[in-house]
Amino acid sequence: MVIAASTLSAETQRIPEEALTQPEMRGAWIATVANIDWPTKAAIGDADLQQKEMITMLDTLQALHFNMIVFQVRPTADALYQSKMEPVSSWLVGKQNGMWTDGTMPYDPLEFTCNEAHKRGIEVHVWLNPYRVTGGGMTKGDIAADHVFYQHPEWFVKYGKQYYFNPGLDEVRQWLNDVVADIVDRYEVDAIHFDDYFYPYRIAGEEFPDAETFAAYPRGFDNIDDWRRNNTNLVIEELHRTIKDRKPWVEFGISPFGVWRNITTDPERGSKTKAGVQNYDDLYADILLWLEMGWIDYVAPQLYWEIGKQVADYEILLNWWSENLYGKKLYVGVAPYRLEPNAEKAAKLKGTAKAWGQPNEICRQIRMNRLNGKCSGCIMYPIHSLMENPLGLKDSLRTTLFREPAETPTTKK
């Protein structure tokens, strides 16, 4: 495959005026695991403070002409919404199925967020992690006693220090479909969203413990890697059907690790990168198949690298993904958290990474997205980094890049 490349620098080309007003996704991830973004630790168990914090974020996004959030509601097989299937999240109330400060469930965070976001013209893409049961410093002892983890221990495996659903089991796929169906049925969400955590990132010297499952349920496969990819393919295909059968207008999006495969691994389809992780080979996520089959509506690769990075160049990857969309939408994940406002730390950055000590790296990437012609917007991770206005990023968005509001590219009902 020939990789498209810009013939002129994104900084030297003029952005067409229409690019500022045409449909463009302008999103931000709101991470709840380990209280990364919301609620803050000060607001754990405090419904009033949680609501105030959410309103502050949404008001800021509205003022900056953002039009989408990706709200994490199931970070560790738990719920930041009212659920009969999984426990109230410890990140919301302090421990799984814990009590609020007043002893009641005073509000439904997902319902509240949908209502308040939609008032402001902001879409809500609901973010779930499919297989992770512990994370963010959790241990087995933090899992609620009535969790499905204890009701069906045969569904779970331990890898490293963490626990996961076993992706090779039909029962696990059904459980995940039931969780998603419950959300789609009961909430006015605009999309279901998964990130890069399918099979977990590899641990050196340790194999994911599913050999017995493979031996018991090979489904015609004789290669465990192909079988694992098929496990992930099956759940994506089934979730697509689960969502669309209920509400055809609700979209299904994936935000994968930024490299599908390196060109040295796959000379015909790989990107000109030298990444240490590859979706297809390490996370068993065949994103291109999902796009080709129409199982997902958009892809938001996490391109958290700078323009010009030798092993994973933002521009090369932007162009690669834009040439492998199969007619679906591309929203690029960008990384405000990598901007370095501390002058002393910025001075220590080496090579192309020096870009993160400059105020314009994210702005350059947004301009490059627009010039690409096939990219329909970006999503920023995480929202708290954006809110901190690193190197004046918020100011640049407000006065220049996001000066005018934009409709979303989302297919409406």
Spans of features found by a protein language model:
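The substrate-binding groove and active-site-proximal loops of carbohydrate-active enzymes
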Residues: N35-D48, P87-Y107, Y159-N177, R219-N233, ...
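N-terminal structural segment of carbohydrate-active enzymes
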Residues: R14-A79, R173
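Hydrophobic faces of well-ordered beta-strands that scaffold small-molecule active sites
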Residues: R26-I30, I69-F71, V124-V126, I192-F194, ...
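Aromatic-lined carbohydrate-binding/catalytic grooves of carbohydrate-active enzymes
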Residues: L64-T104
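Polysaccharide-binding and catalytic clefts of secreted carbohydrate-active enzymes
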Residues: T60, F66-N67, R74, D146, ...
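Active-site-adjacent "subsite" loops/lids of carbohydrate-active enzymes
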Residues: P23, A31, N35-K52, N115, ...
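Substrate-binding cleft of secreted/luminal carbohydrate-active enzymes
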Residues: Y284-Q310, Y326-K413
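Active-site clefts of carbohydrate-active enzymes
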Residues: I30-T32, W249-A275, L317, W321-I362
